[in-house]
Amino acid sequence: MKRTYQPSQRKRSNKHGFRKRMATADGRAVLARRRAKGRKRLTVSDEPRHKR
């Protein structure tokens, strides 16, 4: 049986990235909430990328 989580950087960025969040009013609200809370990483785009 195939596992449900098949990680891919591109899909992750496209679905949960900064530009996707900024594209809608609700997404901007998410960012505002995370800023207010003091999150170190607002979106998955802010996470360090690992060199392969």
From Swiss-Prot:
This is Large ribosomal subunit protein bL34. Coiled coil: none annotated. Residues 1-22, 31-42 have a biased composition (Basic residues). It holds the Pfam family Ribosomal_L34. InterPro entries: Ribosomal_bL34, Ribosomal_bL34_CS. PROSITE patterns: RIBOSOMAL_L34 (PS00784). GO terms for molecular function: structural constituent of ribosome. HAMAP family: Ribosomal_bL34. The keyword Ribosomal protein applies. Belongs to the bacterial ribosomal protein bL34 family. Keywords: Ribonucleoprotein, Ribosomal protein. Residues 43-52 have a biased composition (Basic and acidic residues). One of its GO terms (biological process) is translation. GO terms for cellular component: ribonucleoprotein complex; ribosome. Residues 1-52 are annotated as: Disordered. The gene is rpmH.
